[in-house]
């Protein structure tokens, strides 16, 4: 089956490369030089080349690591499409990635599942949408997209009308599903691709410098750091490294978390990243501690229990399994809607065995059983963080995780910072 999907994707892309959408003539009206200046700075030649390439091609890959201006470039392309009175559709593989897409474009974005109207009744699942006929489709975080979703996107593309921009960062982690689609598409000699490689604010932004050096496998920490040493990076000192041992790492992380809360940081803006779900420094252990600091219980709090976990109003949770046909806040079933794996929200109300949760500004009513598909999300794994944007990430790197902590994983963690 996967071999068939792979062959179909290749065939559809070949057709796409040869076709000429009806609205191509509108793209030919643009002069990229008119968009040379934006957001107060000059566009690079590679950023402008995307507009030039888009004029004559129907499918393009925009690749580049964090800080190279992918978001700014896509925002500019969207402005051009608006000027040409063209429709734009945004998709991403996860709810968190779609939310980031919405933040930097100002347009609604959906998960690929939602965009293709995925439904499931019993054991039968299918994508209801028959055709993608937007003038421009932008798929973000392609490194997280597997062959299955790529196949269903390609199957529904109307190549007579729609142009496609695939956006990704090949330094990030591949999809947990079958296939490394971004990597494979980048290897194609036929698909036009723009790779942005100039990292802006490398010297003055500590987080960007750390993320870039991690990606390149370049050492950036002093070799003589001792226990309890603190090292800052960048002119703005926004990357702070604490040297400590595993024996006190958990205690010091908790102290840091508590200090950030006392400074007035919103718990929603702080997220702890770790490599594993289990173990002393795993997600499960960390969430028990951080829940107490971020959202301590009171005696009269309404509490709902699932296994040995207790949840109450204000707790941050992540959905870890797609929920089909959920109920709105009044308990009415939302046919053909879905809460996606990876969507994050917070509990707003609890009544006996029911609770209400806000996902991305929309409230859903759920019963106690739904908690089996959720986890507290004060701490999450690097894999779950991919595609998200975090105001204040706390990245823990215990010595016991050294065999898991490769440069790609560390890069993903550091590049989540806003």
Give the location of each predicted region.
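ASCE P-loop NTPase helicase motor core
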Residues: 48-51, 56-229
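Short gly/ser/thr-rich secondary-structure transition/capping motifs
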Residues: 40-44, 117-125, 299-301
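Short glycine-/polar-rich loops that comprise or flank the Walker A/P-loop
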Residues: 86, 134, 160-163, 189-194, ...
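C-terminal accessory regions
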Residues: 341-418
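Pre-P-loop entry segment of helicase/translocase ATPase cores
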Residues: 1-52
